[in-house]
C-alpha cells in the first residue's frame, strides 16, 4: 500500500494543458496559444459563427457570394497602423453603428479584432442591432497576418500589426511587430 498521494487524471490533464499553454506563449506566432484562445472564444460565444482567414480569403474571391462588410473592432490607433482592405472601423469601447447605418441588415458582416475576443462580443451586439448574418474572424488580425494575408493602412500596403503588449504579441509572428 502506498502512502503517497496520486494525481488524478483531471489534475494531470490540467497540468499538461497549462504546460502546453506556457510553451505556446514563448513560441513566435504561438500556434498553440492561438489555438487555445480560439477554442476559448468559440466556447464562450458558441452561438456566433466564426470564419477562418482561409475561408474569408475564399469568400472574398468568390464572385458568386455576396461581399461581406468587414468591421475592425480594435482601438483606432491599431486600425490606423494596419487593417484588412475595405474594413470599416467601429470603436469597440463605444460602438457607433451610424457608420454602417446604410448597410442593409441582411448584408453578411465579418467582425475582427486582434485575436478574436472583442470581435465575437461585437458580433453579438451587431446581431442584437438586427444584423442577422454576422460572424467573427477566428484568430483575428493576428491569424490573418500570420497566414500571410495582405494588410493595408491609409497609404496602401502595410507590414506591421499592433501587437497590444508582450503577452498578446506572442500570438503574432515577430516579423509583423513594429
Each predicted region: which residue ranges?
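Rhodanese-like catalytic fold shared by cysteine-dependent sulfurtransferases
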Residues: 2-59, 80-107, 119-178
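Residue-level preference for short coil/turn positions at secondary-structure junctions
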Residues: 64-66, 105-106
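Short, solvent-exposed loop/turn elements at domain surfaces
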Residues: 67, 78-81
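Structural scaffold elements adjacent to functional motifs in cytosolic proteins
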Residues: 68-72
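Short, polar loop motifs at secondary-structure junctions
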Residues: 73-77
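Gly/Ser/Thr-rich loops at beta-strand to alpha-helix junctions
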Residues: 114-118
Amino acid at each position: 500500500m502506498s502512502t503517497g498521494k496520486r494525481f488524478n487524471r483531471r489534475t494531470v490533464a490540467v497540468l499538461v494543458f497549462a504546460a502546453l499553454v506556457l510553451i505556446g506563449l514563448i513560441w513566435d506566432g504561438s500556434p498553440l496559444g492561438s489555438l487555445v484562445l480560439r477554442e476559448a472564444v468559440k466556447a464562450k460565444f458558441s452561438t456566433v459563427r466564426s470564419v477562418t482567414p482561409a475561408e474569408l480569403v475564399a469568400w472574398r474571391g468568390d464572385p458568386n457570394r455576396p461581399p461581406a462588410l468587414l468591421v475592425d473592432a480594435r482601438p483606432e490607433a491599431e486600425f490606423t497602423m494596419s487593417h484588412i482592405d475595405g474594413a470599416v472601423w467601429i470603436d469597440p469601447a463605444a460602438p457607433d453603428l451610424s457608420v454602417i447605418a446604410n448597410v442593409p441588415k441582411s448584408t453578411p458582416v465579418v467582425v475582427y479584432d486582434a485575436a478574436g475576443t472583442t470581435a465575437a462580443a461585437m458580433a453579438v451586439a451587431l446581431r442584437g442591432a438586427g444584423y442577422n448574418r454576422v460572424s467573427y474572424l477566428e484568430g483575428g488580425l493576428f491569424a490573418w497576418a500570420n497566414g500571410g494575408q495582405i494588410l493595408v493602412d491609409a497609404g496602401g500596403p502595410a507590414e506591421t500589426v499592433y501587437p497590444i503588449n508582450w503577452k498578446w504579441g506572442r500570438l503574432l509572428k515577430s516579423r509583423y511587430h513594429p
